[in-house]
Amino acid sequence: MPRISSRTLLPILWLLCSLAAPIAHAQDDEQVARLRAALAAPARPAESKALDASRKPIESVQFFGVETGDTVVDMIAAGGWFTEVLSAAVGPSGKVYSQNPPFLVQQETETALHTRLGNVEAVHASLAAAGAENVDAIVTAQNLHDIYNGYADQPGGEAATVDFLKSLYAALKPGGVLGVIDHVGVAGQDNKALHRMQPQQARDVLIKAGFTIEAESTVLAHTADDHTKIVVDPSVRGKTDQFMFRARKPG
């Protein structure tokens, strides 16, 4: 077999990289344009639009690495703000599973949302039961603190949170991403009452569930938040200090 010298190989590799970069950039531009159009759509509720400035949807999608054509999950979607963002991010060739436990389902809101979005499937059970497997990415925003601290009749705790995260790990394809956003809590505060979580606690349970924490973002950081108020307090609502992790399933 003839050998290829480095003098021959390096220009070929450079050419391939130079061709790939404009294609990737064009795809990114198309996704951003699609997101901006969806966020500004007349049919989108005003209350959803009002959240955009503080939640930074485009920056979040880019940080998590969600791509056109991906299959993704909005885990514990509540009213579906992130479901709509992810729907636009993956485009018509992608799919979004919008998961809510039964007690969180807002049927009228959910029906209206899914009627507008053609690539969304509602899930009211576990991801495994719904057949959501080998997905590219899962996003759960402002939920992990409740799993950890306990909610309704769920006691919470580290073990329960690791089990929850392991169920997400199982639904992801090898190399898939879990995006986590939550309100920052600090030691010495009643974070259960405040609906907050210490970032290190989130790191610990993610690692114990098998994930690698690939990156952290400060795009949702708010230094004016002193972490002592409940997240719905008018003085901090929509302006809480939040952590954002991109965790990856190895493979």
Q: What is the predicted function of each stretch?
A:
Residues 68-69, 92-93, 172-178:
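Short glycine-dipeptide loop
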Residues 105-132:
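S-adenosyl-L-methionine
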Residues 128-138, 142:
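A short acidic, Gly/Pro-enriched loop at the edge of an enzyme's catalytic core
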Residues 209, 226-251:
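Core SAM-dependent methyltransferase catalytic element
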Residues 31-63, 67:
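Class I SAM-dependent methyltransferase Rossmann-like catalytic core
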